[in-house]
UniProtKB/Swiss-Prot annotation:
This is Transcriptional repressor NrdR. It holds the Pfam family ATP-cone. InterPro entries: ATP-cone_dom, NrdR-like_N, RNR_NrdR-like. A zinc finger (unnamed) spans 3-34. GO terms for molecular function: ATP binding; DNA binding; zinc ion binding. The lineage of its organism: Bacteria, Pseudomonadati, Myxococcota, Myxococcia, Myxococcales. Disulfide bonds: none annotated. Belongs to the NrdR family. GO terms for biological process: negative regulation of DNA-templated transcription.
Amino acid sequence: MRCPYCGHLEDRVVDSRETQDGQATRRRRACLSCERRFTTYERIEDVLPQVVKKDGRREAFDRAKIVEGVATACQKRPVSTEQVEALVSAVERQVQELGEREIRTTVIGEAVMQRLRTLDEVAYVRFASVYRAFRDVGEFMTELAGLARKDGEER
């Protein structure tokens, strides 16, 4: 493993453990040259389906895009990086379990919103406002009213 600080190619593993979701191994490493420590994550690379965009284009499933979208929705909210990673891992597992060769962005977006709604309602509304591309304030208010109604039923 190349040291991110000095570029040296040799290090030693100081600590290894599974991540909370059990989908990756977290390793603390120490560079044998500069002695600085850094963390790496190892995860099994699964074959994920092609994503069919709204305009019909196809592209490879990109976990980083989902992480970025969820993290943006969660900015300045009490949601940790670990919670974002766990949410994205759950969506990724759901996509894998479908066993399809292709999946529409709408399926991925709805899976993200379903989980985000239980994690943080403000982040959910932020994500939904971009994902659903509301045409006007009325559509946005309808979504908020639906959220408030569902929230009232759960209490």
